Amino acid sequence: MEREQKKKFYITTPIYYPSDKLHIGHTYCTVATDAMARYKRLQGCDVMFLTGTDEHGQKIEDKAREAGVTPQQFVDNIVTGPKGVLDLWKLMNISNDRFIRTTDDYHVAAIQKIFRKMYDNGDIYKGKYVGKYCKPCESFWTESQLVDGKCPDCGREVQDAEEEAYFFRLSKYADKIQDLLENTDFLQPRSRVNEMVNNFIKPGLEDLCVSRTSFSWGIPVDFDPGHVVYVWVDALFNYTTALGLYNDKYHDYDHYWPADYHFVGKEIVRFHSIIWPAMLMSMGMPLPKHVFGHGWLLLDGGKMSKSKGNVVDPYVLAEKFGVDALRFFLMRTFPFGSDGNFSNELLINTINVDLANDLGNLVSRTTAMVQKYFGGTLPAGCKTCAAPEAYDTELLSLASGLRDRYEADMEACAPHKALEEVFKVIQRANKYIDESMPWALAKDMDANGARLAHVLYNLLEATRICGILLAPFIPDSCTKLFAQIGADEGVQTWDSAKVWGSRPEDAPVVKGENLFPRIDMDKALEELEAIRQASAAPVQPAIETEPWQEDVDFDTFCKSDFRVVKVKACEAVKKSKKLLKFTLDDGSGTDRQILSGIAMYYKPEDLVGKTLVAIVNLPPRKMMGQESQGMLLSAVHKENDEERLNLVMLNDAIPAGAKLC
């Protein structure tokens, strides 16, 4: 079927903030979105599944400074480095069609156009922000919105904030947003609506700060370069720029927008259900059809948080128990719209009970009996039985109606309920084995061979239907399942899941390895605890520092003039592989030029706007035909025999020309 003839379905995760490695909570949302995307592809829809990373902001800038790298280097490591975001989604078998980074050039250019359009239509204006700011959440608050003087979202300390800023006229759209929330199914589950209306809209929506001047790591406002676009515009519009809005990178905005679903954690429902639709209204753009705010995975009763350090590493669990087992656990165990308490014991128990005992045993016992009693191929005529037993009819009826029940739950964004329906059939099939007693029938094949073949066909067919509907959740395991029960691609379809008897009678059955081996609970918990303790005390790399220099007297030291400098421009020096040329503001009113041999450590564009330290009273010297008027300070060491260099970077609030003493 051509793309234009298929029903389109556009679904997104939030774009994650790469201030640290992602944890099991991020994995939960992404697996849920992936399962929904796979389900819609199974139905034959034209699916676009987007995820990505939100890479700008003060927190990233500060963490990069602490690490002695540029913000771009910092986020590159988290996103594309070993066991980074991209590696994690590959490991978890995430089938996203696109991945957006807000540092992508096409997104940057598009955001500048979007910001200007809202400014030109009067919905963005310049003013002064005075209030409170939560750096971990990157959220602004008024005094009245604080809870016990702390951030109402995360409960952490806030800081005073005062700076020139641009504001979005959020208050202008308050009535329209309230109507959207109260009178449509835009925001789900419904319990989120009262929270948004009562806590944010009815107390009075205030205009929203949408630019910052107190840090530089962001998209510059092109008509006022002292400002960078704040997260609300930069991050939220990713859902449209990734389709080609205001850029030539992609060309399917008109095809896929509006989104069918934004899946987001409940802590960012406010941004997606109030701020996001208001900005789209300002732009004259269609609104997404639904925002679904899922619950949190709790650890010891509290929310997991990178900044709190109480997170669970999905890499450890996936590598220990298997990717499909982890995917299944996340979707089977926790109602998607509610919070759930995570524990390793619960994970292992779910794997053992549902996957090893119920599903694994059904596949293993059925395929083993087909091999043992019929050499792997059932005889002709096994689909039908002249005198079916009541339990035959019960299994057939339950399995034949499974697809409709499953579909209703998936459409309601209740994957845990959809899986519950599948496992009702699996459990009924296991009971069917006990009721039909194939081993007893096999004692007299002449009298009971046809009946035995019919029983085993029923088991294979029930397993096939369950496998089709489990595939969005455990795709690799279902591929193995289909191979074992003799179900080729033609009977793995959505349509065939509703048609009992689709599997050919003579399709070969192969007894394969157990899909989900049982896990020794005590042993696994001991191993996980050992891993946790080892990761809590990371091995420090072998570091070598330069040898100490001979002592100098205080007067000699004081002759060196250390000054704070701001990078106005930076470029590579032609015909040099090592040198970068800096144009610096040293507070004197005249630009200072310094050449530094750090090209192998930094990209010049990443250093513009940074606050550095220079010795400014060294005699000028010629380098590659150009004059260098001083030296930038950096730290040099060897780590695992590799030389590392980090420029000394200071807080951007320190003015150019300030003397270090």
Predicted regions and their residues:
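Intrinsic disorder at enzyme termini
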Residues: 481-558
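Structured secondary-structure scaffolds
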Residues: 2-51, 106-110, 154, 160-372, ...
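N-terminal catalytic cores of NTP/NDP-binding nucleotidyl/phosphoryl-transfer enzymes
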Residues: 2-74, 78, 100-115, 120, ...
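Hydrophobic, well-ordered secondary-structure elements that form the walls
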Residues: 272, 301, 422, 459, ...
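A glycine-rich helix N-cap at a beta->alpha junction
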Residues: 80-97
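Cys/His-rich short segments
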Residues: 121-174
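Helix-rich, typically C-terminal accessory recognition domains appended to large enzymatic cores
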Residues: 126, 333, 338, 346-383, ...
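Phosphate-backbone binding interfaces of nucleic-acid-interacting proteins
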Residues: 537-661
